[in-house]
Amino acid sequence: VYKRQGQNVVAADRITVEREARERQDQQVTILIHKPMGYVSGQAEDGHEPAVVLVTPQNHWNQDTSRTRFNFAQLKGLAPCGRLDIDSVGLLVMTQDGRVARQIIGEDSEMDKEYLVRVTYGDRDIDVQSVFPAEQLARLCHGLSLDGEALKPAKVDWQNPEQLRFVLT
């Protein structure tokens, strides 16, 4: 029986989760959507709608074999796992389950996140790869920072002559 937070246990102790807690956990949803351009990942901002408005019964995958069916209560507490800019398109994972979020974006996450980025260099937007300096590509792999903090190294290579593929862990 749970007595207090942080209670110590020994190997011989038996730990179970009460049925009510399991059922509550089972009711949490994770939703995958393809975010189109023009929507923000999280809260509405600057007059732009959040991607969560795209989650409707009409957009439910028709081959879903789970017994879970859409209801508007599922939108409460739904948070994006990561961020796609308003001009970005791609897979957006939204969840009510903190365990899922930590697996995807937690500090210790080892899950790769892949981005394709259309590149211009100077006034060149066709066959950019042929004029893009190799040292700048190397810098993209090891010299990125955000808000003054160095980021983990990224894998960066050419997807095609106009697009770079970034893989972030």
Residue ranges and their predicted role:
Residues 3-169:
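Basic, flexible Lys/Arg- and Gly-enriched helix-loop patches that mediate nucleic-acid binding at interfaces
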